[in-house]
Amino acid sequence: MRIRALTAVALVGGLGLTLAACGKEGTPASPGGSAAALPAYTVAQNVDVAGSPVFAKIKAAGALTVGAKDDQPGLGSKDATTGKFAGFDIEIAKLVSAGLGVDPEKITFKTVDSGAREQAIANGDVNYYVGTYTISDKRKQQVGFAGPYYQAGQDLLVRKDDSSITGQETLKGKKVCSVTGSTPIQRVRDQKLTEPGGSIVEFQKYSQCVEKLLSKEVDAVTTDDAILKGFASQDPEKLKVVGKTFSKEPYGIGLNKDDKALRDKIDDILQKAIDDGTWKKIYDATLGKSGSAATPPAIERY
């Protein structure tokens, strides 16, 4: 499950996290495509994040629970047979874990859909969340964000034989599908892009929207281009991405709103990864198989 073309930035490494031949291996790359291999991860030793209640719990447990998506090709997906999670975001979660001093093998990945992310973080059901989670001022009122680690843009997925949709301005009268609680569908609603005569359809998973698109029950699926390209790469004879982004969607790592110490630590991990080129190794072994270049984002500390 690979994405054909997208611009991404993989978070990797951190203070105390380095590449080493003897470290923990990341998620194996999918067969085919580039031969680039994921780097090994060395688990940082004697990590301390003073003033972080979440880190104190992590350290006491010696393990992590990370919220993620399980239905996004190339980003976060779960193998139906093995139950293992794989993808760009999954590797990011593992790299942060190693930087915090926890063996990535001790992560329990928990599927959390878009509409339930804030509650899962607030309840402490997950230590942090990595899953195409767009940073916004509204969300910052409920959760904290480290990053961004990736810059996406909203786009449209349509049937390959449909030439009537060429951008956001051509959605009038169309049925557009996305995930409940997501930034993209709220933008469609706020800007009234389907009016007059159109409608909005919402589901819990993007895969459900894609099924409705293929069965011609909706006209387009909208979300970040990275996600859409993943689905298009699975069925290129029937689906295509319009290719005209109309937003900037900075992906962040969601965590407890009041835990600034942990947020700062993860920002440090991200910055070092960008500076030393480690993120590029991760990108090349995952989303880099799309053939597009990657541009690191600027970390936005607050």
Question: What are these regions, as identified by a protein language model?
Answer:
Residues 150-158, 229, 233-268, 289-302:
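Periplasmic-binding protein-like
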Residues 116, 133-141, 189-192, 214-248:
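A ligand-binding cleft/hinge motif common to bilobed small-molecule-binding domains
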Residues 31-128:
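Extracytoplasmic small-molecule ligand-binding "clamshell" domains
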Residues 23, 34-49, 162, 182, ...:
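Extended ligand-binding regions for polar small-molecule ligands
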